Amino acid sequence: YLIDPSVNNLSPTEAISLGLGLIFGGLFVYEMACRSPLAKYPLLFGLCLVALICAVTFLSTQWFSGRGAYIHVGALIGTIMAGNVFFNIMPNQRKMVAAVAQKGDIDPQWGAGAKLRSVHNNYFTLPLLFIMISNHYPMTYQHEYNWLVLIAIMANAAWIRHFFNLRHVGKTKPAILVSGAIGMLLIALAVSWPSSQSVSVEKSEHGDQALAVV
């Protein structure tokens, strides 16, 4: 299901190479950004991260089948999340615990770096959950604008997650949840609505069948 000749006639070797390059290349860019001065500006960093995910989503749909593209975007997000936990959040926590036990100084960067990555993981959760079950919703990855559909779903999912994050700190904003739900409903209607291309093809097929009968 990775290769779709109608999208890009890749050989298995080319498809695998592009897939691995997309995942580990995206991870490399993310890691470099986390270690750069950009990490000091969370909002700007977040916008750059959104741009990265959007670019990966678009490129993957130009290279692979819709199904394969969605899975590769999910693989990148999942790899970033796992790397954040195992190579930054947990090690930094151990350093802080060890420093407290030894009554030493705690480097503020340990907590700042772990918090930044933890926030990213938090907002990645719902988008990744959708990608994990997206195989059951072919109307999304088979859509003419499947890359835009996935971006819209991920953005809405992250927006809904924002509602729960605010509620955890005592701020309840129902408008966020309602607007997120409306957004999801509109996306569902959009992907369920037959495209003009499919309608014209269907009419053509019916016409051919009628001519054959005549």
PLM region descriptions:
Residues Y1-S204:
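Polytopic transmembrane helical bundles with strong interfacial aromatic enrichment
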Residues H206-V214:
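Sequence/structural segment immediately N-terminal to covalent heme-attachment motifs in c-type
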